[in-house]
From Swiss-Prot:
GO terms for molecular function: RNA polymerase II CTD heptapeptide repeat phosphatase activity. This is RNA polymerase II subunit A C-terminal domain phosphatase SSU72 like protein 2. One of its GO terms (cellular component) is mRNA cleavage and polyadenylation specificity factor complex. It is an enzyme of class 3 (hydrolase). The lineage of its organism: Eukaryota, Metazoa, Chordata, Craniata, Vertebrata. Its EC number is 3.1.3.16. It is found in: Nucleus. The keyword Endoplasmic reticulum does not apply. The gene is SSU72L2. Pfam families: Ssu72. One of its GO terms (biological process) is mRNA processing. InterPro entries: Ptyr_pPase_sf (IPR036196), RNA_pol_II_suA (IPR006811). Keywords: Hydrolase, mRNA processing, Nucleus, Protein phosphatase.
Length: 194
């Protein structure tokens, strides 16, 4: 078993749906978790498919919620965005960018390959200080409410297995292979260093 609590980060594009659903579930299971986005702005589905609503990362979830409530309560209730923002507000004040975080993690889960690439590139561009390893694992999760929930439960299962592991470094590859077979998903995995 790990001698200390597993430190987990979950990263998606905007830190609104996929990473926050995983944050919510992992937190409820008592895991040490933070969540992030990687883009320069938060983009939410707008009233039309090609017209997203764009916010700065400094905008709180409550401010986004109130803005969308004023703009079109029915539309944003129907598409689930108001529900998501309400949940997010109960977890933390607002979205955070991964590139601005200086905390160390044991495992970082990303929700799509472009986010994985951004996280790995960012970690590799930082000056190495402690040479502590961090495992970066990508799991493709579609940006829908249902897929975010399913992905969050799979991330949670992996984290719980890692928490019980005698040696995470030795057991992670085997665990990922087992999860790939069980879930029918493939994972990208690499190790970076702080």
């Amino acid at each position: 078993m790990l001698s200390s609590t597993l430190r987990v980060a979950v990263v998606c594009v905007s830190n609104v749906n996929r990473s926050m659903e995983a944050h919510s579930i992992l937190r409820k299971k008592g895991l040490s978790v933070r969540s992030f986005g990687t883009e320069s702005h938060v983009r939410l589905p707008g009233p039309r498919p090609n017209r997203p609503v764009v916010y700065d990362f400094a905008t709180t979830y409550k401010e986004m919620y109130n803005d969308l409530l004023r703009k079109d309560r029915e539309c944003y209730t129907r598409n689930g965005i108001l529900h998501i923002l309400g949940r997010n507000e109960r977890i933390k004040p607002g979205p955070e960018r991964f590139q601005e975080c200086t905390d160390f993690f044991d495992v970082i889960f990303t929700c799509e390959e472009s986010v994985y690439d951004t996280v790995v590139e960012d970690l590799c561009s930082r000056e190495q200080q402690t040479f502590q390893p961090v495992h970066v694992i990508n799991m493709e999760i579609q940006d829908t409410l249902e897929d975010a929930t399913l992905g969050a439960f799979l991330i949670c299962e992996i984290c719980q297995c890692l928490q019980q592991s005698d040696d995470m470094e030795d057991n992670l590859e085997e665990l990922l292979l087992q999860m790939e077979e069980k879930a029918g998903k493939s994972f990208l995995h690499t190790v970076c260093f702080y």
